[in-house]
């Protein structure tokens, strides 16, 4: 069901300046969603630049200076960078309004399929920054919720333009729903894989949306031990995995090793890409490969 988000709750009217006001976000996918709804009303900048890990990134002194000029900060809420830096960013720019884009998202605990429920009850699972699997944007369901959170935030800080934000929000929702429809169509094919391996488990929400099995290579955020590698090779064969995803900010040597032992393909993806729709489609497309003759690798 589509949630209706009201712009009329809270917020204050912005006085327009000659210079375009700035909104800062943590990562590039969030910049994509924010720009899609904000249009030309704001300049949107990302704290974590392309090619950097949002788990370990440290902002430059210039970024901290620039942040003081921002109107608002949109955060995912559970990324390592945010866990480490939010308090410091607040101290650096006490006027800055923070908005959590994970609000109303049903969260997953790390590499498990346990859920963090709204009543605060958390099932036992792995620990990550904040104890939560943070890659909420890699999901068409969550993307619609994030879009609603962005809409509410923009209306709170700039009520005068709420109608324009609502129009762009509706257009973005249509694009997200179209992307979801195409992915559902692809993954409903009998040739579509139901399991995949990935170095860093960034596709937990993608896997949940489409009932897939994600098998992470790293163990607790660390390189796999020789024993764990052997278990992964066995899992790869047992689950009939044909694709191993690797990301640019992580070492791919273990993925290549498993691929050599199992005949699987290594496919590069970038879940942190600004081009969210294209990245989601590419990920789904990689799971839709013609079957090889029996006994042969890819």
Language model regions located:
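Sec-dependent bacterial lipoprotein signal peptides
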Residues: 1-5
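Extracytoplasmic metal-acquisition and chelation regions
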Residues: 7-298
């Amino acid at each position: 069901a589509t949630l209706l988000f009201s712009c009329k709750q809270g917020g204050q009217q912005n006085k327009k300046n000659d210079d375009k006001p700035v909104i800062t976000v943590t990562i590039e996918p969030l910049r994509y969603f924010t720009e899609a709804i904000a249009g030309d009303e704001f300049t949107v900048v990302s704290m974590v630049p392309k090619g950097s890990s949002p788990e370990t990134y440290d902002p430059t002194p210039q970024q901290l200076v620039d942040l003081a000029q921002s109107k608002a900060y949109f955060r995912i809420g559970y990324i390592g960078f945010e866990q480490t830096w939010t308090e410091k960013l607040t101290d650096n720019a006490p006027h800055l309004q923070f908005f959590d884009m994970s609000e109303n998202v049903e969260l997953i605990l790390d590499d498990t399929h346990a859920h963090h429920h709204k009543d605060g009850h958390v099932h036992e699972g792995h620990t990550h920054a904040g104890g939560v699997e943070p890659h909420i944007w890699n999901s068409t369901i969550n993307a619609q919720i994030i879009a609603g959170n962005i809409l509410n935030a923009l209306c709170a800080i700039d009520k005068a333009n709420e109608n324009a934000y609502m129009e762009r929000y509706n257009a973005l929702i249509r694009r997200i729903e179209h992307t979801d429809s195409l992915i559902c169509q692809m993954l409903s094919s009998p040739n579509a894989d139901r399991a995949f391996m990935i170095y860093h488990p960034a596709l937990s929400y993608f896997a949940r949306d489409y009932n897939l099995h994600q098998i992470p290579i790293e163990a607790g955020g660390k390189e796999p031990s020789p024993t764990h590698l052997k278990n992964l090779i066995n899992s790869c064969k047992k689950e009939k995995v044909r694709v191993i995803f690797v990301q640019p900010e992580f070492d791919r040597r273990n993925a290549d090793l498993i691929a050599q032992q199992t005949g699987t393909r290594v496919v590069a993806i970038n879940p942190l890409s600004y081009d969210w729709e294209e990245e989601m489609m590419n990920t789904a497309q990689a799971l839709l490969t013609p079957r090889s003759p029996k006994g042969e690798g890819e």
